């Protein structure tokens, strides 16, 4: 077999080995270079791709659409209101139908079990564009961004501050440990990662020679961090008292003081977006008026600083997703010997 990715789904980071994840990051970098030099790479010429969305999206939808087009494939957007998905037709039946017509399926939605069922019953590669538990394509983009800035991943220190139970915290914790990145999660005790996720990360960290720190002290979390990462304080679809969440997470806001607490002038600031860094959105304006705040998980001065790389991350979603689709569906020659 010339390509050990061929026909495989990408549902969560641990579906692949650390070496395979590292390969996909480098492959994404290569595809980004081809795009920058206007070199065609239609590895999926004639393929048809279903883009199945339960949740709204800017970056994921755009990245999958452009990546598919660049690869020569035909993407078809299917939102939950377009089809009978989960209402009048089961996930299993939908998977079988889509698998009979499409060569690959992207899913962005709520339950991890949904994307797992799509992969089990469709018979084609399925790619997780986001679920409540994992966000693997975002992680590839994030780590591509880290590698572009620092030249390597192993030995870097990344601190995530905020809601430690969400998909980004899970993915950063586990995938970072897999690739030898020292990971610190700074969250209040009530919002720290699930013990099973922490145990999994610790297992990978031990093998990779990296460290995992879970702490309720934001200053401890960010000490000597090469990268600070945060995400929205309330995830899409989550029913929560905003006032209580703000009270819990305000000490973990990325601001100039927390950035300075890293002790490094070279620290970069990351966010998967969208970000409530000002009041220029309907939600931001509403919350700002209600709670007397001008920013939430990250202040605008830090978001606009030279140390932020959030829009580089956003742009890297496309080559990262392109790498996953091409590797799993493109009949490429990828010698298995490089993974031994």
Swiss-Prot record:
Reversibly catalyzes the transfer of the carbamoyl group from carbamoyl phosphate (CP) to the N(epsilon) atom of ornithine (ORN) to produce L-citrulline. GO terms for cellular component: cytoplasm. It comes from Lactiplantibacillus plantarum (strain ATCC BAA-793 / NCIMB 8826 / WCFS1) (Lactobacillus plantarum). This is Ornithine carbamoyltransferase. It is found in: Cytoplasm. It catalyses: carbamoyl phosphate + L-ornithine = L-citrulline + phosphate + H(+). SUPFAM superfamilies: Aspartate/ornithine carbamoyltransferase (SSF53671). Belongs to the aspartate/ornithine carbamoyltransferase superfamily. OTCase family. It comes from the Bacteria. One of its GO terms (molecular function) is amino acid binding. Pathway: Amino-acid biosynthesis; L-arginine biosynthesis; L-arginine from L-ornithine and carbamoyl phosphate: step 1/3.
């Amino acid at each position: 077999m010339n390509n050990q990715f061929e026909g495989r789904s990408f549902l969560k980071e641990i579906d692949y080995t650390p070496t395979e994840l590292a390969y996909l990051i480098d492959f994404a970098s290569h595809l980004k270079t081809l795009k920058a030099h206007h070199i065609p790479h239609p590895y999926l010429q004639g393929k048809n791709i279903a883009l199945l969305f339960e949740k709204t999206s800017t970056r994921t939808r755009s990245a999958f659409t452009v990546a598919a087009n660049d690869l020569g494939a035909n993407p078809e957007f299917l939102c939950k209101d377009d089809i009978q998905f989960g209402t009048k037709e089961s996930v299993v039946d939908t998977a079988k139908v889509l698998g009979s017509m499409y060569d690959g399926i992207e899913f962005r939605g709520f339950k991890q079990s949904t994307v797992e069922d799509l992969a089990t019953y469709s018979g084609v590669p399925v790619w997780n564009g986001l679920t409540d538990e994992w966000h693997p394509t975002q992680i590839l983009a994030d780590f591509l961004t880290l590698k572009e800035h620092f030249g390597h991943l192993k030995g870097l220190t990344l601190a995530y501050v905020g809601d430690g139970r969400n998909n980004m915290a899970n993915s950063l914790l586990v995938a970072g440990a897999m690739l030898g990145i020292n990971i610190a999660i700074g969250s209040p005790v009530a919002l720290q990662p699930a013990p099973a996720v922490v145990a999994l990360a610790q297992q990978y960290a031990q093998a990779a020679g990296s460290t995992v720190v879970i702490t309720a002290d934001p200053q401890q979390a960010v000490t000597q961090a090469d990268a600070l990462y945060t995400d929205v304080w309330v995830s899409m679809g989550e029913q929560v008292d905003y006032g209580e969440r703000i009270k819990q997470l305000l000490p973990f806001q990325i601001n100039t003081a927390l950035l300075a607490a890293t002790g490094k002038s070279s620290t970069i600031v990351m966010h998967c977006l969208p970000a409530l860094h000002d009041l220029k959105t309907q939600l931001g304006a509403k919350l700002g008026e209600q709670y007397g705040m001008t920013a939430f998980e990250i202040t605008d001065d830090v978001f606009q600083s030279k140390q932020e790389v959030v829009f580089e991350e956003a742009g890297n979603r496309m080559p990262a997703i392109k790498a996953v689709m091409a590797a799993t569906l493109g009949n490429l020659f990828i010698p298995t010997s490089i993974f031994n």
